[in-house]
């Protein structure tokens, strides 16, 4: 009988197979649930991926049997150290790789979280380690059934998916253009997205109504990290997780990881968000942006200068475009894209004014008009790609491009145009981005620079030996330098300057004012995840009608997007040419939403988004979020798309009670509403009667 080694406390008990070194049991001590439901699916504790120096091929190396396990105690912490001295080359009869590893697992006496590190020792002249998948778990689900399990996945601003064992195997996920499920030769379904960009944060969470599982990377070096999820599907139900680090370990070298965290809880995903935030608060700082930006609730997005050879507006039209946005919607912030040579998504990164749109003088004069009429301008710059048809592709594009392990460039296609991905950790490209952004602020009077794709598209490892990065996984550090130095430089030109990026990245948020957040309804998008974890970060949400939808579907989607932006306190992203296509009823709803957003802004400025915390019960069919207000008081925002009449909102009763409750809504109604004290078990609650006839979005202030 193989001996098991254990590590645990009152929260959990972890068991390690003494021969194979894999997790054999993982028990929640409060619920008694052993998360490991499929022993046959249980995998190794780690996997290595190495380059065969002779063939140049990438091979998978699996740990062979354990050579030693040490148990330790130091103060209030216990530990296990599991040592392996070699690795088996998967799928071959090759001699074992002389690559050893030691896994350390450490836990405090009264903490649901354990910390995991791995040390890799490469003594094999045949192989160079380039990827480390660790920690790695397989064979899990929670409770008696997997069908009520929920996964929280940090794809862009977040996903929340019920029953991923099933959903991740459907055509919906198999057919995604990014972050898609793939099926391996072994029949295993998997998703893997890299941090920081496609994955906005470095943690995942899995829970049901009694159990929780948290996996996070506490990597202060911010290496490119693949957040991997696996499942056997409904016919072989289990889930798996892993964190992949891209790092080179050559023969004779040793590499030790930063900690990863594994926690066994009885809580939902909010616990994971708070725990991750507690860690990262010691690593990053919150942004310090100009005060006037707190009053910006909407921006005028102008992608309508030149696209695919078609001219829609010229630089001389900027004053009238600005005036129209200001008059119709109160827009002061003019976001200018498609201004560069050949227009949107062409000839990047040639960020020079397109000659057919006008002269640099006309562009500068247009910006001056905006600035002199109480507005300000943000310019679009793509921070990622180089058009292969550019005149400079052979001389600069190929040199700056990222290279994979075979020396090939990473190619991406947008519309009819092909690009290569540039290496943000190569100093030449960094300097070009920094200087182009600075030039737009100095020469054209812009206050904002928007770096497209920076927090949205996937990071990759770069193997180009001629680049200035010290290792293959330094993608994120490159963009951090760009953001930090560009912000400092443009603030030196104009202290009111700021940066924006596409989508979200926790480490990038320290340097930006707004993240243009989008994902896709089919992705189980859940923007509340990023907003709750980082309530200080401003999200800019797309609030335009969808071109691919018509009729009722188009109307419902616009209502949903506007309502979500109101609940999250996001800045509205609206294009005048798109708003002009709205029917009268939808146009009226857009304007009503803008009015409500402006009325809510003083509350958002002194509030903190806490998602549904403190909400005990809500009427069916309604979505409710909670903002805690500085100085006392609570704001509850309710989206009621079906216009369900009445109902009761039950909330935790704040200390000191409630003096009174008022409401206002998207239709312009407002007034006092009734509430009464009640209880749920031992807890006191406030039962707030929702007014009949209220609008689709209802705001409740409890003082």
Predicted regions and their residues:
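Carbohydrate-binding surface patches
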Residues: 195-207, 615-656, 697
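Active-site-adjacent "subsite" loops/lids of carbohydrate-active enzymes
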Residues: 309-315, 361-363, 367-368, 376-444, ...
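Polysaccharide-binding surfaces and accessory modules of carbohydrate-active proteins
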Residues: 3-8, 12, 33-91, 106-224, ...
């Amino acid at each position: 009988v193989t001996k098991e080694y254990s590590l645990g406390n009152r929260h959990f008990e972890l068991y390690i197979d003494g021969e194979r070194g894999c997790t054999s049991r993982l028990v929640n001590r409060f619920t008694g649930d052993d998360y490991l439901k499929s022993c046959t699916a249980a995998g190794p504790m780690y996997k290595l991926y190495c380059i065969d120096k002779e063939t140049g091929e990438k091979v998978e190396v699996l740990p062979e049997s354990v050579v030693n396990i040490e148990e330790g105690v130091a103060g209030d912490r216990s530990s296990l150290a599991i040592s392996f001295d070699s690795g088996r080359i998967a799928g071959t009869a090759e001699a074992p790789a002389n690559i050893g590893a030691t896994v350390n697992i450490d836990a405090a006496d009264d903490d649901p979280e354990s910390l995991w590190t791995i040390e890799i020792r490469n003594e094999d002249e045949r192989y160079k380690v380039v990827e480390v998948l660790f920690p790695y778990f397989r064979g899990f689900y929670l409770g008696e059934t997997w069908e009520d399990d929920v996964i929280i996945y940090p794809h862009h601003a977040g996903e929340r998916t019920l029953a991923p064992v099933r959903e991740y195997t459907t055509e919906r996920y198999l057919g995604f253009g990014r972050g898609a499920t793939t099926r391996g030769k072994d029949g295993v379904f998997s998703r893997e997205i890299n941090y920081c960009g496609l994955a906005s944060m470095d943690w995942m969470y899995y829970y049901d109504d009694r159990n929780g599982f948290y996996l996070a990377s506490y990597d202060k070096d911010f290496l490119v990290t693949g957040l991997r999820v696996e499942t056997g599907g409904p016919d072989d139900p289990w889930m798996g997780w892993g964190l992949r680090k891209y790092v080179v370990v050559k023969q004779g070298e040793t590499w030790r990881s930063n900690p990863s965290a594994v926690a066994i809880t009885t809580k939902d995903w909010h616990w994971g968000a708070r725990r991750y935030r507690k860690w990262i608060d010691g690593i990053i700082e919150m942004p310090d942006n100009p005060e006037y930006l707190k009053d910006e609730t909407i921006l005028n997005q102008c992608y309508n200068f030149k696209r695919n050879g078609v001219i829609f507006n010229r630089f001389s039209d900027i004053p009238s475009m600005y005036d129209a946005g200001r008059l119709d919607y109160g827009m002061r912030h003019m976001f200018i894209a498609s201004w560069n040579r050949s227009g949107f998504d062409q000839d990047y990164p040639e960020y020079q004014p397109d000659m057919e749109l006008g002269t640099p003088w006309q562009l500068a004069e247009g910006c001056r008009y905006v600035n002199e009429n109480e507005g300000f301008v943000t310019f679009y710059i793509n921070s990622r790609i180089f058009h292969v048809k550019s005149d400079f592709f052979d001389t600069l594009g190929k040199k700056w491009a990222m290279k994979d392990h075979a020396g090939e460039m990473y190619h991406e296609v947008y519309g009819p145009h092909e690009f290569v991905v540039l290496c943000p950790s190569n100093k030449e490209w960094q300097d070009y981005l920094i200087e182009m952004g600075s030039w737009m602020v100095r020469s054209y009077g812009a206050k904002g620079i928007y770096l497209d794709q920076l927090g949205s598209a996937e990071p990759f490892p770069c193997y180009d030996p001629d680049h200035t990065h010290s290792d293959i996984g330094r993608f994120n550090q490159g963009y951090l330098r760009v953001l930090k130095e560009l912000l400092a430089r443009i603030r030196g030109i104009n202290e009111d300057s700021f940066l924006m990026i596409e989508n979200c990245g926790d480490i990038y948020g320290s340097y930006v004012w707004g993240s243009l957040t989008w994902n896709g309804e089919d992705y189980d998008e859940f923007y509340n995840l990023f907003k709750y974890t980082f309530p200080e970060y401003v999200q800019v949400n797309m609030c335009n009608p969808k071109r691919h939808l018509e009729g009722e579907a188009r109307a419902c989607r616009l209502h949903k997007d506007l309502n979500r932006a109101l609940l999250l306190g996001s800045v509205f992203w609206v294009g005048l040419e798109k708003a002009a296509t709205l029917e009268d009823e939808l146009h009226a709803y857009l304007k009503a939403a803008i009015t409500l957003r402006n009325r809510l802004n003083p509350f958002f400025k002194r509030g903190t988004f806490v998602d549904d915390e403190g909400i005990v019960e809500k009427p069916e069919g309604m979505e409710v979020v909670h903002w805690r207000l500085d100085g006392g008081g609570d704001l509850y925002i309710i989206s009621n798309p079906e216009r369900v009449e009445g109902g009761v909102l039950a909330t935790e009763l704040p200390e000191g009670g409630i003096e009174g409750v008022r409401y206002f809504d998207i239709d312009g109604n407002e007034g006092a509403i009734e509430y009464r004290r009640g209880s749920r078990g031992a807890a006191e609650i406030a039962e707030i009667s929702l007014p009949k006839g209220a609008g689709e979005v209802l705001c409740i202030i409890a003082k």
